[in-house]
Amino acid sequence: MRPAAISVILPAYRASSVVATTVARIRSAMPGKEVEIIVVDDGSGDDTDLAASRAGADQVIKLQENRGKGAAVRAGMLNAVGSHFVFTDVDLAYDPSQIPALIDALESGADVALGSRRHPHSSEITSAPALRERGSRIFNQFTRLVLRSSYLDTQCGLKGFTADAAHAIFTRTKVDGFAFDVEVLHLAEKLSLKTTEVPVILDHIEQTTVRFIPQATRMLWDVLKIRMWSALGRYPDLTLRRG
């Protein structure tokens, strides 16, 4: 890979039926760009890893057990070789044509570029179910209260990082589940990284492999753990070293 490569990390769980199409769509969305696609199979137990390899993913990382989206994204980030890293959902709820906007923000000086469904210029093709949308808003309010953060949308599945920022953040993350996004943003604040929010277009696809209530309970508990770890100094050396 050339130094200017864009690394796209796809955490995948039981995604054998969609991963090949996803890999192809990401490549076609950035013609002329050197793109590294990393699929992290989060202990799917099906043929997700084989389908990703056959589709031409540059790296396929297979976790031996289902550890969670946070663990999968971390594994991809720590194995990526590009100068800009992006993670997105394998079901492409955010069309890959939106990735260049994140890269533009990073090249304009941001360390972290956050897709935000709450951005005034964001829109929806297909909305999330009402229960999930309400739950998302409550979770964001809870997160802002517990961590004293200012982010309106922590859980958007489209985020970009410079290589230095990604390394600084993901070598310190501890959360393996869906609340990892909150930990990522908390660490970005603690590391004094420059963040910017980018509008997105959401085309929601319901994830039948996600059990909403148990996951929501775990996410709330993980946010409390992030607060505790931060207060107890469990995150090491919060100093950004730029390459």
Give names to the regions the model predicted.
Residues 35-38, 49-79:
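Conserved donor nucleotide-binding strand/loop of the catalytic core
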Residues 5-7, 36, 183:
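Cell-envelope/extracellular polymer assembly enzymes that use nucleotide-activated donors
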Residues 15-18, 44, 69, 95:
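Donor nucleotide-sugar binding loop of glycosyltransferases
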Residues 149-150, 172-176, 185-203:
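Catalytic donor-sugar/metal-binding loop of nucleotide-sugar-dependent glycosyltransferases
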Residues 15-30:
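Short, well-formed alpha-helical segments that are part of the catalytic scaffolds
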Residues 63-79, 84, 96-178, 205-221, ...:
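Acceptor/aglycone-binding surface of glycosyltransferases and processive sugar-polymer synthases
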Residues 41-49, 92:
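A conserved acidic beta->alpha catalytic loop
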